[in-house]
């Protein structure tokens, strides 16, 4: 067999062993995808003993391509929610997540300066302690740019030393915070449910009876609120007749309007129109129905709802729009993206015609447009290679192969559609590419670092590196968790999700969810901080490398 064939065969063997190890669980907690790293270490230990030669160029390509695949698909996944997570509702949670990252970075500086740990090893320990593999890739990239030799081996070994407690440390922090504040989980869950029901900003339906004499004879568009497109009127009931109103529909006293909007907008409409009636409007004789329709027609991508003329042509109202899990009130100026879910209301005989304009081809949601994938990857590599200069920094910074594809993917996923190209990827396809990428990357890191792992652990500084990893993992989590409880007044379950999200650690999220099942507090806070944290975890090793290398 050629060296390339041997190398690829061993990579497959590493993946099999590593994924098998990752499925081992103790009390529901396992290494997960991190098991691939240890699979690589085990295989590398024996390949060194038997003198098997691996092709260095193949390993290098597989490592870099795996990293690119992983960070790009992460960006596509979190892109739609990345910018919305920075809004007011997530500011407090993201602020505490940033604090964890800052404290962890300070801990790295202390380990490097006071304990005199080499920079590459310190960054490897940092990546393992926060269980973030893209951070490892980003650190290796920037150190290679700075001319530090053998970064893959030393960083891989130190990463592996710190990784196991990186997972366990999060769980320990959750447990200690619970003991310290004598938390009663059932009370926390009840408090979260009560607060979330009050603060929920999703859209609602109400039915209002027109009693304001000033509105009699006005068209719908002339009524304040409708002209501002704050709410949508999906149905109008007059006596025994029910219609889907148009902007030009005249309103009469005692008409019943079914409105869709947020609580504040609906409260304003009560003051303008009249009082709320208990019985919602219903469709008579099956003439009016509603459907949830997915935007899949390439001809409407990037177009405004007004330009489609659906309301004018078919008398169909789009009452709600769900984009990446966020409910919006659609307006005439709303631009449609692939995968948007529209709630459409209209007469049965014409609703299907309107649906055909939007698409609603479910099979398209299972397909992947490969052209946008490679455009995104190509642009990401290009952006990652562009140097930019910051005053006071000794060298030009680059986003690199870890940061470039991530930033480009975030932007493209947020834009959603350019012409007939759409940066939507089915969750199953995204997960598959992401898992392939991270498995390839970790397999190579394990193979490169495995030869010296056991010697470092037994005869070298392995145990010392583990101690530094515990310091970097545990101290920032405990400090932030206590501050979030004392001063942030955060719910304990929310704090657990915050800690798991700040480490981008799915096993920790699974543990947090099991603390109180059927409660979404942990998952919600995890999802809120995850996009920003993933971005900062990739950028922080690069900034630390440049700052500490120059110091």
UniProtKB/Swiss-Prot annotation:
Pfam families, A to Z: Asp-Al_Ex, TrkA_C
GO cellular-component term (any): plasma membrane
Xref: Gene3D superfamilies: Regulator of K+ conductance, C-terminal domain
Annotated GO biological process: potassium ion transport
Domain RCK C-terminal: 191-275, 277-360
InterPro entries cross-referenced by the UniProt entry: AAE_transporter, RCK_C, RCK_C_sf, Transpt_YidE_put, YidE_YbjL
UniProt name for this protein: Putative transport protein NTHI0043
């Amino acid at each position: 067999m050629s060296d390339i064939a041997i190398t690829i065969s061993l990579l497959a063997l590493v993946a099999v062993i590593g994924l098998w190890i990752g499925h081992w669980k103790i009390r529901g907690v396992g290494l997960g995808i991190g098991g691939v790293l240890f699979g690589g270490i085990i295989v590398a230990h024996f390949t060194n003993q038997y003198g098997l030669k691996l092709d260095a160029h193949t390993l290098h390509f597989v490592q870099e391509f795996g990293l690119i695949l992983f960070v790009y698909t992460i960006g596509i996944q979190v892109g739609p929610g990345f910018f919305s997570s920075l809004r007011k509702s997530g500011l407090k949670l993201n602020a505490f997540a940033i604090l964890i990252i800052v404290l962890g970075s300070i801990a790295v500086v202390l380990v490097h300066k006071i304990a005199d740990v080499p920079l590459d090893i310190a960054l490897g320990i940092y990546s393992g302690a926060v269980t973030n593999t893209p951070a490892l890739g980003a650190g290796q990239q920037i150190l290679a740019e700075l001319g530090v030799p053998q970064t893959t081996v030393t960083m891989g070994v130190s990463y592996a030393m710190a990784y196991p407690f990186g997972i366990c440390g999060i769980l320990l922090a959750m447990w200690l915070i619970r003991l310290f504040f004598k938390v009663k989980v059932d009370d926390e869950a009840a408090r979260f449910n009560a607060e979330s029901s009050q603060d929920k900003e999703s859209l609602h339906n109400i039915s209002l009876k027109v009693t304001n004499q000033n509105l009699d004879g006005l068209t719908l568009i002339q009524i304040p609120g409708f002209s501002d497109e704050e709410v949508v009127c999906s149905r109008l009931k007059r006596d025994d007749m029910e219609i889907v109103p148009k902007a030009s529909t005249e309103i009469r006293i005692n008409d019943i309007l079914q409105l869709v909007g947020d609580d504040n907008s609906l409260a304003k409409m009560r003051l303008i129109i009249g009082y709320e009636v208990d019985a919602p409007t219903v469709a008579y004789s099956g003439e009016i129905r509603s459907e949830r329709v997915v935007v899949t027609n390439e001809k409407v991508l990037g177009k405004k709802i007004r330009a489609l003329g659906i309301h004018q042509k078919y008398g169909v109202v789009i009452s709600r729009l769900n984009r990446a899990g966020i409910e919006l009130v659609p307006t005439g100026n709303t631009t449609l993206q692939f995968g948007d879910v529209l709630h459409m209301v209209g007469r049965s005989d014409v609703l299907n015609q309107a649906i055909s304009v939007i698409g609603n081809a479910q099979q398209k949601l299972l397909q992947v447009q490969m052209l946008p994938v490679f455009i995104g990857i190509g642009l990401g590599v290009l952006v990652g290679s562009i140097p930019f200069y910051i005053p006071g920094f000794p060298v030009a910074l680059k986003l690199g192969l870890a940061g470039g594809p991530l930033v480009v993917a975030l932007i493209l996923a947020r834009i959603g559609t350019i012409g007939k190209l759409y940066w939507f990827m089915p969750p199953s396809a995204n997960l598959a590419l992401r898992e392939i990428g991270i498995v390839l990357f970790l397999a190579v890191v394990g193979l490169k670092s495995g030869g010296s792992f056991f010697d470092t652990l037994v005869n070298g500084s392995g145990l010392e590196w583990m101690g530094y990893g515990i310091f970097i993992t545990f101290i920032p989590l405990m400090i932030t968790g206590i501050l979030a409880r004392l001063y942030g007044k955060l719910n304990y379950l929310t704090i657990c999700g915050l800690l798991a999200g700040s480490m981008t650690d799915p096993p920790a999220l699974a543990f947090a969810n099991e603390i109180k099942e059927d409660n979404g507090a942990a998952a919600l806070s995890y999802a809120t901080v995850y996009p920003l944290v993933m971005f900062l975890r990739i950028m922080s090793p690069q900034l630390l490398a440049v700052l500490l290398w120059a110091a």
